[in-house]
């Protein structure tokens, strides 16, 4: 599947290429791209790691599961996600909008991506109007998934 792209300058092209890695699909259209933490800015990556240490501890102690997982953060549901109508659009500043369908679900996410010398890193993801970074920070500060 070839995503539709808007006209982009060099920095925007690098941001788009990063997002394309996250939403890569196989021949049937199923998601098999990278997880975003691999491309997270160092501070964001540290926040993710700290939050997952807490999440893992909660799950081991209580058997409860937290509703935080990278595939959910990227707009993928349970199981196999079949991506269609992928559109990647650079917005103003560091934002890149990603829209796609997964079955009957329509997803609209924004990635905060900064680039230096065409090396780009993800600072945050806005999914369903919520900052993923802030959700992880809340887990760290409260030591809970609530």
Q: Where in the sequence are the language-model features?
A:
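Low-complexity, intrinsically disordered terminal/linker segments enriched in charged
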Residues: 91-93, 99, 104-106, 124-146
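Extracytoplasmic/secreted proteins, especially bacterial periplasmic and envelope-associated proteins
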Residues: 14-21, 39, 43, 67
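Surface-exposed, charged secondary-structure patches
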Residues: 45-105
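N-terminal signal peptide c-region/cleavage motif recognized by signal peptidases
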Residues: 3-5
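Short, aromatic-enriched amphipathic alpha-helices that serve as compact interaction elements
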Residues: 11-31
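Sec/Tat-exported extracytoplasmic proteins
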Residues: 23-30, 40-56
